[in-house]
Regions:
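Phosphate/diphosphate ligand-binding glycine-rich loop within oxidoreductases
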Residues: 2-118
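Phosphate-coordination loops involved in phosphoryl transfer and adenosine-cofactor binding
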Residues: 5, 122-125
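Glycine-rich Rossmann-fold phosphate-binding loop(s) that bind the pyrophosphate
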Residues: 13, 130-132
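Short, glycine-/small-residue-rich phosphate/pyrophosphate-handling segment
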Residues: 103-104, 124-126
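N-terminal Rossmann-fold NAD(P) dinucleotide-binding loop
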Residues: 135-136
């Protein structure tokens, strides 16, 4: 790890299932970035302390997944999207403050558009099954 290398992580509990490091480190290598993407298994009772000191752990940002998204919203400065969904899944520092957003809805809709183009034409009602960020 270089002196100026950037580190980002996915924070989950458990975290072993996450393929995020594999995916992100592939693209980091492809673009020859001096960065690393790691996995952090943080239990719910330790999450507030970990997030409050994210920078002290060497991170410039993080992706958040189950079961921490709602807590992340409360511990950061969320944008409108995160507030609307009630959960945060992407964190970064700006002006030394930890900010957050939510990309679940955007990702859900992008996948729906890719699989079923025009799905929303003439649509007035829809049923979304689930309780995650995409369903909100």
């Amino acid at each position: 790890m270089g002196k100026e290398q950037k580190a980002v992580c996915v924070i989950a509990w458990p975290a072993g299932h996450s393929r995020s490091p594999l995916i992100h480190n592939y693209w980091i290598k492809q673009h020859k970035l001096d960065a690393e993407y790691r996995r952090e298994a943080v239990p719910p009772d330790k999450f507030p302390e970990f997030i409050t000191h994210l920078h002290d752990h060497g991170y410039i940002g993080a992706n958040i997944t189950v079961p921490h998204k709602e807590t992340a919203l409360k511990l950061t400065e969320p944008d409108e999207r995160a507030r609307a969904v009630g959960a945060a899944n992407a964190l970064w520092y700006k002006d030394s403050r930890l900010r957050s957003t939510n990309t679940d809805v955007e990702g859900f809709l992008a996948n729906l558009d890719a699989v079923t183009p025009g799905w929303d034409r003439g649509l007035s009602t829809a049923v979304v099954l689930g309780a995650g960020g995409g369903a909100r």
